[in-house]
Amino acid sequence: MKLPRLAFLATLALSSVAILTLPAVAQVTVKMWSIDGDNGLYTKLVEDFNASQSDVIVESRLVPFDDLVNEALKAFATGQAPDIISLDNPDFALFSSRGAMLDITDRVANSEVIDTSVYYPGPLASASWDGKLYGLPKATNTIALFYNKDLFAKAGIAEAPTTWDELLEDARKLNDPANNVYGITWSARAGEEGTFQFLPWVQMGGGSFAEVNTPGAVKALEIWKTLLDEKLASQDVLSLGQWDSTGTFNAGNAAMAISGPWELGRMATDAKFDWGVALLPTETEGGPRSSAMGDFNLGIFASSQHPDEAFKVIEYFASQSDRLFPEFSNIPARSDIALPATGDARTDAALKVFQEQLTYAQPRGPHPEWQKISKAIYDAFQAAMTGQMSPKDALDAAQATIKGIVG
């Protein structure tokens, strides 16, 4: 039966309205937490991701470094955790071992964006637990020895020190109180940055995070204490973080500094002297090398209501790895990305040293109780450097605490 023309048009109009008023696909909001003070990296990448598509919007919250773990644990326990979090790599095992992080092993294996074979083994291992992958390294870094070539020449020192004893002797020669110049600066603060700096010395001294009182580790702490006792370093090293302590070097008020590649951008512009970077000195000539392995891992909380969308965000961040160094002075955790020349000869030479140092870098842990282990370590060197305990007694006490944790 044919509909009358008016009835047909009315039916067509109603059908068109129905089609036009079908509900649109809702935009998914993914919440993300990361630390503040990361050269604006996450802020920029989140902005770019949000601008690149309209299906997912990332809401980013920046949390102070010292507060991130405790706030994240509380949030997960109360059902208020974000979808994505960026955690310092030694803290990752605390969350993944407790079932707080989503197992992304299969998602990564099926991803057309992420290829785990191109990641450095150390950073990738820090995002793993019990044979499964719970996160992805954002970047990686390590520490080496910065030195002021002008002050070295003035003191008659031809090269950067290669052993601990040479470092101590050079610091004595370079120390110049009359001109407000210390021999060396670094971070020995009571916190993760201090452990980050001290653990490589323990490892070069034959120890590990689970064995911190070897004779070599004791010698390392004796040297740290001597540097402070002889006023070859400012007392501020006990409280300053790496960024601020290296600022002393940049200002020309310390002849050496132990710090990382995140300093290179401002050093190229702020330092008004000739400088270089050398591998960390070893306990003895030709002795075993080590260095810290830093930076953050991205993971998805197991409680996330939007795991697929959250994984798309992580894939996007992984796809932007070639931007990490040129824009943010971060070294990618991937071996397939060549660092571009910066145009600054000193910076380019320093990057080669840092890349070599990375081959010796070791993770902190991984262990679910890393924060307790780290506290035992920084409590020990703080106690020794402030004269409360001898270096040996302090490290023996730390070892007793750590043994009770790791068994």
Located regions from the model:
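Periplasmic solute-binding protein
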Residues: 92-100, 122-159, 187-209, 229, ...
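Extracytoplasmic "Venus flytrap"/periplasmic binding protein-like
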Residues: 28, 48-119, 128, 153-162, ...
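Short, solvent-exposed loop/beta-turn-alpha elements that line the ligand-binding surface or hinge
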Residues: 105-119, 183, 188, 202-222, ...
